[in-house]
Amino acid sequence: MKNRTLHYIIRFLVGDDVPSELVETIGYTADPNKFDRYNVVIIPSGFFDGQTYGTPASLPELPLQEVQGIPLLFGSPKEEWVRDTWVVHADIIASTYFLISRYEEMVRRGLRDEHGRFPGKESLPYRAGFLHRPIVDEYRMLLHRWLRQSRLRVPEVKKQIRKIYLTHDVDSPTLYRSWKGLIRSIRDRRGLYKSFQGKFGTLEKDPFYTFPWFCLLYTSPSPRDS
């Protein structure tokens, strides 16, 4: 695993409100000779090993174990003091990476629905029963507890949503302008004139072309999604 990726995940878990110095107190190593460098050490589970990563063997096995009541994808719930370092075998680094990257969609490439999408009911969060839980946020709180347990002062996590970005997928911006749409129009007995008008006419006459209305709705004083 590249140091840049590791640093990003640790920083992501710790949170932007936490000083950078605290990130350096967290180690991701199985080498006991390096434990003394850190306040908290997370033991790698082997998920990122070259022979395992990207293969079906890297996928979590059900049922999942738990660490302090939180579903754990990789590692074990074992926690212990090794001299002055709090060492945990719960690999929340790999678990977080798996969840935020949608890693399983890469490994299970052949599993897609009729639209080419990964089926939600095949996802690990659904099959493991934690689809309704913000597991990565719970990992963050857990990591903060570990840091405090190692006698570090960690700011409280601010419970707020900073920004929400609304997106809208438009699968078919027009109904009749494609060749399939033209055939559909003729099949629906709209007549040849209207069918060809739908194919080659102005966009404003296509019933699916509602972007001006949508933009007006979105920029109104009380925008609503529909």
Where do the model's predicted regions map?
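Aromatic- and glycine-enriched glycan-recognition loops and surfaces
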Residues: 195-217
